[in-house]
From Swiss-Prot:
The keyword Lipoprotein does not apply. Keywords: Cell inner membrane, Cell membrane, Membrane, Transmembrane, Transmembrane helix. GO terms for cellular component: plasma membrane. The keyword NAD does not apply. It comes from the Bacteria. Signal peptide: none annotated. Pfam families: UPF0060 (PF02694). This is UPF0060 membrane protein HEAR0108. It is found in: Cell inner membrane. It is a multi-pass membrane protein. It comes from Herminiimonas arsenicoxydans. Belongs to the UPF0060 family.
Amino acid sequence: MFELKTVALFVVTAIAEIVGCYLPYLWLRQSGSIWLLLPAALSLALFAWLLSLHPEASGRVYAAYGGIYVAVALGWLWLVDGIKPTNWDVAGVVFTFIGMGIIMFAPRA
């Protein structure tokens, strides 16, 4: 159960990070309102706070989180940008999940 909570927290964290970066992109590249920067800053603050909720050392958390981030970013690519991930994209996610699993679940001395 702990692992499922951890992965769910990583997913929410990734969404907060992506939204926090996507909104300034809309402002800078898509002629969005400068007011998009306010929710972007709040989203990035939420992202940082969510990362602090994990009991592991921060470097390990960031490394393991990276695997979930890659998967969520490809989901964003598909759902928001309307671009279907390629088989190579999916293979990349599988490899990042393998690395994430090793980092998260390896025995600790």
